[in-house]
């Protein structure tokens, strides 16, 4: 009999989750006695507690978010067992037409950032490494579903997110 194995993703079904679906479709998990069911998530800060509470035995999440979670919850029964990205896909996307061509250009502009976003969580060290005056950057808390549309509609000058997700969403919205 197959062992049920719920798997919590950090995000929607996008490119990075393809290997897991490939393994399901080609019977790799089944041949190991596993019945894997993949659930979409709402960010790493959604996936990690699902595993820590036992709601899911395994999940996919950003290592930086896990470190932050474990700092606040040192006795949580959750560990990292594998690295997927060789470097994080954190990015800030801005529009040339709005004057964003370098990190310093964020000063005097509005940055749209979802509060639970992994890229936003790394903004402070990014700003420090790039000598940014964060007091000159207006940060607009935005939702994940509205992030790219707000940039497309020029309601914000730049956004935080994962490079591959933002790129595809912005192309879909017709942003050059």
Give short role names for the model-derived ranges.
Residues 156, 171-173:
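Extended amphipathic alpha-helical interaction segments
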Residues 165-166, 173-176:
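Short, intrinsically disordered, charge-balanced linker/junction segments flanking boundaries
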Residues 1-153, 157-164:
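Short, glycine-/small- and polar/acidic-enriched structural segments
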């Amino acid at each position: 009999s197959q062992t049920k194995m719920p798997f919590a993703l950090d995000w929607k079904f996008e490119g990075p989750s393809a290997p897991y679906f490939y393994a399901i479709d080609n019977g790799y998990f089944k041949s190991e006695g596993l019945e894997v069911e993949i659930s979409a998530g709402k960010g790493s800060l959604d996936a990690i507690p699902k595993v820590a509470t036992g709601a899911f035995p395994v999940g996919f999440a950003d290592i930086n978010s896990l470190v932050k979670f474990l700092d606040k919850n040192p006795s949580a029964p959750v560990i990292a067992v594998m690295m997927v990205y060789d470097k994080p896909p954190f990015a800030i996307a801005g529009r040339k037409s709005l004057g964003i061509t370098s990190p310093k250009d964020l000063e005097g502009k509005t940055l749209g950032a979802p509060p639970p976003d992994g890229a936003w969580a790394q903004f402070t060290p990014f700003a420090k490494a790039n000598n940014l005056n964060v007091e000159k950057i207006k940060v607009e808390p935005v939702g994940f579903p509205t992030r790219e549309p707000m940039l497309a509609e020029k309601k914000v000058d730049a956004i935080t997110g994962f490079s591959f997700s933002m790129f595809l969403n912005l192309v879909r919205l017709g942003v050059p």
